[in-house]
Amino acid sequence: MKLIIQPDDGPTVLLSALKNAKKSVEVAIFRFDRNDIETTLKAAVGRGVKVTALIADVNRGGEKNLRQLEMRFLQAGITVARSANDLIRYHDKLIVIDRRILFILSFNFTHLDIDHSRGFGILTKNATLVQEAVKLFEADCARRPYTAGPDSFVVSPANSRKVLRTFLERAKKQLLIYDPQISDKEMIATLQGRAKAGVEIRVIGKMSGRANVMVRKLTRMRLHTRTIIRDGHQAFIGSQSLRPAELDSRREVGLIVREPKVVKQFLETFESDWNAMNGGSAQEASKEEAPSVTSQKVAEKAVAVLARELRPLTGTVKKAVKKVVAQAGEEVLHDKIVKSTVKKVIKKAVKKAVKEAVQDSEKA
């Protein structure tokens, strides 16, 4: 078993495994913009490897990219399946190679997640876990119901709530948690109960009703992982936050990990991130400052993308104004109240759309 730590490890481990695929690659995709991974998947097809991609039906704001990805994959000879719409989202991220190697990831196949965010991934050759991942993948590709397998393979909505609640309840000394948003009432009550019992609980991320729980916001990079380290001996890593939707209404996948070396790496990374948010050492402080330049570049790139995406909006507004003029006459263009109202309506609509897009990105 191997732990992948982002952004430190980058795509190297994934690319190497894909390049060494001999018979098959099965990949579940929620967000995707990595040319290096796309090129490697296409090259695998060229070697005679059967590549199957299960692509999410929706990921608010990115459906156009997903549909374009489907077409590129199909043209390259990749078999494409699209997730059903029975759940709010299919948010899992996994890869099965030659039906003997399994990757379970908290991060998407994007530059933002891999290069600029705290995320984790697990590579395992455990035959039981690989078999269960294949069972889930095939069920979702065929849009058949999935029945939960071993508790170590955590799937929403099949068994996540039960397994993760039990995982938290069994903490004796400590729970260290990465989670962008803990808001499920049952999970919060469980955490508060363990805190009252003397269990040390620290959260990097956000948590509602956090009595007796220490919470800090990750400042040196974006947070995009859901991880729980219990008593320094076991860990959960997956795509599901402790939120109602991600436990009950979305496809999410995670693993319970007991490998000592991997759990130790989780623990060390958490402590490093935690300490960096509390003054830390001079070395930690310098690391915290370093991403600021990168963050600026990411922001500039995001603004450029936003500007391109907003160009069609101009045409839409023009059409709407012409329609109003056609119905009410040109005099409305000289009415200050009408002009002011139109500006406010457009500004409000854009503001709402941007807010929803940002919230969706944080939850993805």
Regions inferred by a protein language model and the residue ranges of each:
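Active-site metal-binding motif and surrounding structural segment of the metallo-beta-lactamase
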Residues: 25
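PLD/PLD-like phosphodiesterase catalytic module centered on the HKD motif
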Residues: 1-15, 19, 34-103, 107-166, ...
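Residues on the solvent-exposed faces and adjacent turns
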Residues: 29
